[in-house]
Amino acid sequence: MGSAGLEQTKARLHINCAQPATRTWQRKFDDEGKKIEQFSMTMNDMISIIPLILKGLMVNADQMGKGRDIQYDPFRKWMDNCYRGLPIGGLGAGSIGRSYRGYFQHFQIFPALYEEKPILANQFSAFVSRPNGKSYSTVLSAPTADALKGVDKATIGSWDWKLKEKNCTYHALFPRSWTVYDGEPDPEIKITCRQISPIIPHNYKESSFPVAVFTFTVQNSGRTPADVTLLFTWANSVGGRSELTGNHTNSKMIRW
């Protein structure tokens, strides 16, 4: 369906992509959330899971003996955080997570490969210019200070990471979400990003497509026209010579 057909369909169905649903889960970008803490176990709990641990180790040893990568490594430290929003993608098609702070994280596309940290190259950015010469630009996400720590200032570190978090709100109602940038980067511009994954009632086949749609709506409340440019960047998500620069890895499930 072309852009004209899409607009006709939205008009017929009375879809306003810039308006979040009335009942949504909401978070401000500057919301620190509730930090995830490790739970403790009693001695009885530890004793009760010994058979499960032994079975898991036996399965891993069997997989390694057959030349396959193990599905779950109990000795690996998993990173988790409280910033997760809705996942992207259809049912059973793997997923790419998205934080309520605007960035992509928790990649789970290939079996046994989990990329939990945000890939900083995967971003939406906005550039605004007006006839009076004023211009504004920013990356439309707010990674934590830890995510930006150690980033090369000559590459991704040179991007405009100056989003005012208090002006941005995330709304979620599965399978949709809305990210509203009110006054960002231009004080008189409002940008709404609508995300939707293909969850179609009674249609499992097309609900399993590994796709998602992002629709942007820009509203100008100023008295002068604005030239708004949206940029989408994405690092190599499959592998190859550039995979390491995007924090990606290649791994064989079976050694031939």
Model regions and ranges:
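Beta-strand-rich N-terminal accessory domains
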Residues: G2-A145
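Soluble extramembrane domains flanking the early transmembrane region of eukaryotic membrane proteins
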Residues: K10, K153-I156, T245
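Short alpha-helical segments and helix-capping/turn motifs at coil-helix boundaries
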Residues: D69-D73, K77-C82, F110-A112, K162-E165, ...
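An acidic- and aromatic-residue-enriched active-site/binding cleft used to recognize and process polar
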Residues: L91, R98-R101, I109-A112, P131, ...
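Extended, loop-rich substrate-binding clefts of extracytoplasmic carbohydrate-active enzymes
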Residues: A145-V211
